[in-house]
Design a protein with these regions (language model features):
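Signature of N-terminal electron-transfer/Fe-S-associated modules in redox systems
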Residues: 1-154
Length: 154
């Protein structure tokens, strides 16, 4: 198998992987970063969301070959001011119920606040539409995003 070079969370990785292997499985099985979750395998639930060059991307349908030379950030590598505000708001407002979808939710919310520091409810709903929460904590997710935005603007 060909060797694929990746930069994940600021670290260079060389992995032996078929170029069509989804990034999700390379992150989890080859690199050992299990915070990114498998939910549906067809980019419909958002559990597999990572950042690629600062944009939210579904890793379950992204071939690892499409990522060569690009910057990948997983939930384990988040460290921006917006990410810290989102994580704090998630804890403060008790957003998590079962927790399975939360890494994807946090990844999407972080990109939203990095691009739009004062989102409206509509902005939040649009940005988070690709993330499904089977426990239906959507109201708490929206409240946490507003709280994180307020913290960032303080």
């Amino acid at each position: 198998m060909p060797v694929v070079s990746l930069k994940v969370n600021g670290h260079a990785h060389q992995v032996d992987a078929d170029p069509q292997t989804p990034l999700l499985w390379v992150l989890r099985d080859e690199i050992g970063l299990t915070g990114t979750k498998f939910g549906c395998g067809v980019a419909q639930c958002g559990a597999c969301t990572v950042h690629v060059d600062g944009q939210a991307m579904r890793s379950c349908v992204t071939p690892v070959s499409a990522i060569a030379g690009r910057k990948v950030t997983t939930i384990e590598g988040l460290g921006s001011r917006a990410a810290k505000a989102v994580q704090k708001a998630w804890v403060d407002l008790d957003v998590v119920q079962c927790g399975y979808c939360q890494s994807g939710q946090i990844m999407s919310a972080t990109v939203l606040l990095e691009q739009n520091p004062k989102p409206s409810d509509e902005d939040i709903d649009l940005a988070m539409a690709g993330n499904i929460c089977r426990c239906a904590t959507y109201a708490r997710i929206r409240a946490a995003i507003h709280a994180a935005a307020a913290q960032l603007s303080a």
